[in-house]
Every structure is written in C-alpha cells, then in structure tokens.
Design a protein with these regions (language model features):
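Catalytic Walker B motif of ABC-type/P-loop ATPase nucleotide-binding domains
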Residues: 150-153
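The feature captures the beta-strand-to-loop junction immediately N-terminal to the Walker
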Residues: 35-37
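Conserved ABC ATPase "signature" region
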Residues: 106-121
Length: 250
C-alpha cells in the first residue's frame, strides 16, 4: 500500500531550483533512506512532501487537511533542542494532542518510551537532558503520534554509535510491522545496512532509487559524493564504507 506519492515536486528559491521535478512513492513495510551531499535538497524535499513549504507539483500528503495529515504522518525535524521545562512523559504526550482514533494512548506512549530507551526517563525534565537524549525524546513524541507514515530529518545525527544502531534497528522494526519510514541520512553505511530502499539526491534532482545493492555503486558514489567506498555483503545487509575522497571540489 502506498502511503506517500510525489509527482513532479519542485521547490525554488528565486530562480534556483532546490528540489527539481522529483517523483517517487513510499509504501508500507519500507524503510527508505534519503541520501545526498550537503545542499542536495533532502530537508527541503521532506518539508515540501509534508506541505510545510511552498512547492509546485503534487504531494499526496500536502493535499490533506491538517487533521488528516496529523493522522497520516509523523514528522521529526532536524532541530533537536527542547525549550519547554516539562517532563519527558509530558513532552511525548504532545504527540497525541492532534485528533486521533480511539486507541490505547497509554500503551502507545509506553511503547514509544520502550523503543527509544526512555522508560526510566519518564519523569525527568526534558530541558535537563543531553542533546542526544533530547533527540530520543522528540523521536518518541513522533512515535506516540501512531501514524502509518514517519518522516524524519537526520534522526540519528548527534547520537552515539550504539544509539544510532538501535535507532536504525527500531526504524527497521517499524517498517516490518507495516509502517512506512522515510529518513534523511548522512551515514551511507547505516543507510546501506538497514534501509530497504535508497533515494539518492544530487543538486535537487532524483539521481537514483532502488535497493541498497543497486544504488550504492562505485559509479553513483563517485558521481554524487565524489568518494570511493568499500563494499561487502553480510548476513546483516550491505556494507558501504567510504574510504577515499577522489578530488577536492571546493
């Protein structure tokens, strides 16, 4: 089942195209990694897909009313700092303020706490946590929204290696349970290992879409990222470890 459809989506800043004529679909049971160098348009694409910024073309999410959108997609932006001095539990409950179906909200919140490793943090004050811990709180808030689709902008940025791995595994588990997950990433190795589909952007354009083995090729990495990588297959998935910058481009 398709949860998000983009048709010829474009965003311009003045005369400059930031996202240029992108068409794609995100389905249930998919963990999709959105990758590309700095300035490729990843954040802009996510915001346009949600209808948060002006765009041309079509996004199936942006067409929905705010109520329908809040029931369809949860959003975790790149900004991580929490400025309200309330408990972790109260912060996560903010994800359920939008109208929702009649579900066991306490069970959903407890599940979000458990998935993000915050069960013992529920009474801690959010503003007193570290940056990485606050990122996990905001992720739990998005999970508490209990939507079929999750969009997250660099959700593992600033996390320690162990938490990055557990967070990526959690996203994979959510996809296996029937959700669609679209996340932007800078770590190509984690994207290749955990994601079921890769979307590679270059200068705002869709360069390649497909499974990691198909997309994380020397040709694509050299053209888009100007790097060479070590490739291997394991029982955990594809390894794609950057090892060499080909030439300075600045």
């Amino acid at each position: 089942m398709t949860l998000l459809t983009l048709n010829n989506l474009s965003v311009r800043r003045g005369q400059c195209p930031v996202v240029d004529d992108v068409s794609l679909k995100i389905n249930r049971n998919e963990l999709v990694g959105l990758v590309g160098p700095n300035g490729a348009g990843k954040t802009t694409l996510l915001k346009a897909a949600l209808g948060l910024i002006e765009h041309t073309g079509n996004s199936s999410l942006a067409k929905l009313s705010l109520k329908e959108r809040s029931l369809t997609a949860a959003w975790m932006p790149q900004e991580r700092e929490i400025n309200w001095p309330i408990s972790v539990l109260e912060t996560i409950k903010l994800g359920q303020l939008s109208p929702s179906l009649k579900l066991d909200k306490d069970k959903i919140i407890n599940d979000a706490l458990d998935r993000t490793g915050l069960t013992n943090y529920r009474e801690r004050i959010s503003t007193e946590l570290s940056g990485g811990e606050q990122a996990r709180v905001l992720l739990a808030r998005a999970l508490a929204q209990n939507t079929p689709l999750i969009l997250a902008d660099e959700p593992i940025a600033g996390l320690d290696p162990a938490t990055q791995l557990t967070t990526m595994k959690m996203f994979g588990d959510l996809a296996k349970e029937g959700k669609g997950v679209l996340i932007s990433l800078h770590d190509l190795n984690l994207a290749a290992t955990f994601c079921t589909k890769i979307i590679m952007l270059d200068k705002g354009q869709l360069h390649a879409v497909g499974n990691p083995a198909k997309i994380m090729t020397d040709e694509n990495l050299e053209k888009v990222f100007n790097i060479r990588a070590y490739h291997a297959r394991t029982d955990k998935g594809i390894i794609c470890q950057p090892i060499e910058v080909l030439s300075h481009s600045y």
